[in-house]
A protein has these predicted regions:
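Short, Lys/Arg-rich, polar N-terminal cytosolic tail immediately upstream
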Residues: 1-25
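A structural signal for multi-pass alpha-helical bundles of membrane permease subunits
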Residues: 27-312
Length: 312
């Protein structure tokens, strides 16, 4: 073989190898190109704002001062020393826990009613539309509806006074004794359809053979519900409850449009507390510290949600 031929073969081999390397590189990079837009948006809309808020929480007079000084954890110490902050934490937990519990109970009850064969299909169709109505309204509309219903001259007080249950007009959203309970009730009404739809889908996915076998073994309706229905629905219940906990803990529009955190901080939750620090008191550094606290709570709940999803 001549030297020219050997050189040609070597050159072709190098070109082929270069092409193979290029192909392998493209194969590795192609998936990254698909996720690049989502990664860019995540960094732009999520990661960058979180880092910015964390930086503000460690500074004095962030945004308001041109040369804001680094103060470490002083803003956290300040809000932790504020009684209103801890009041808002307690009220947030009450608002969230009560909402999640009653969302589950009401959603499960309505799902069972819509799934039963004892109710005529036409009636079930009507009930399905009625029960899902709260989902059709925005938070602003829901706030307006309940402000009208629970107005001192509204329909609730009229009914209660007609039935002689109360002898005076109750200030549902203006009294420190009733405001938080009324607000929680409004949020419960707005949020149960998510559970109803999810649990109804779960009920319809349970094999009928399980109930038939349990009936043959002599199980009554309560035993079927306890030992078949609930265990089959438990993965859905846990997933929805954790998501609902995260969402409810961050509720802002409904609270702001009904009570604004009042009266006298009676319905102050973490979201309204943070908003007032930022846009009423212009304490952006302290508001950032409060926002980081909310983020930590949300991330803790998210951790349990992801752990549960992996276990499934």
């Amino acid at each position: 073989m001549s030297l020219a031929t050997e050189g040609l073969i070597i050159t072709q081999t190098k070109i082929r190898k270069r092409g193979m390397i290029s192909y392998k590189t493209r194969k590795r990079l192609t998936p990254l190109l698909y996720v690049a837009p989502a990664t860019f948006l995540f960094c732009l809309l999520m990661l960058f704002p979180m880092i910015t808020v964390l930086r503000y929480s460690l500074m004095d007079g962030a945004i308001m001062k041109k040369d804001a000084a680094f103060v470490g954890l002083r803003n956290y110490v300040t809000i932790f020393a504020d009684p209103v902050f801890w009041q808002s934490v307690g009220q947030t937990l009450y608002f969230t826990v009560m909402s999640v519990i009653f969302h589950l109970l009401i959603g499960l009850a309505f799902a069972l009613l819509l799934n039963t064969q004892r109710v005529h299909p036409a009636i079930r169709s009507i009930l399905r539309v009625l029960y899902i109505l709260p989902w059709l309204f925005t938070a602003v509309i829901i706030a307006i509806i309940w402000r009208l219903i629970l107005d001192p001259n509204g329909v609730v007080n009229s009914i209660l006074m007609t039935l002689h249950i109360v002898s005076f007009k109750v200030e549902w959203f203006s009294s420190t004794k009733t405001a938080l309970h009324a607000l929680t009730f409004a949020n419960i009404w707005a949020g149960y359809p998510l559970y109803m739809v999810s649990l109804l889908a779960g009920l319809q996915g349970i094999p009928k053979d399980l109930y038939e076998a349990a009936g043959i073994d002599g199980a009554n309706e309560f035993q079927k519900f306890r030992y078949i229905t609930i265990p089959q629905l438990m993965p859905i219940i846990i997933s929805i409850a954790l998501l609902d906990f995260i969402w409810t803990m961050q509720v802002f529009p409904l609270v702001w449009m009904t009570t604004g955190g009042g009266p006298i901080h009676a319905t102050e939750v973490l979201s309204t507390y943070t908003y007032k620090l930022a846009f009423s008191s212009y304490e952006f550094s302290q508001a950032s510290a409060s926002a980081i606290f909310i983020l930590i709570l949300s991330m803790s709940a998210t951790y349990f949600y992801i752990k549960h999803q992996k276990a499934r």
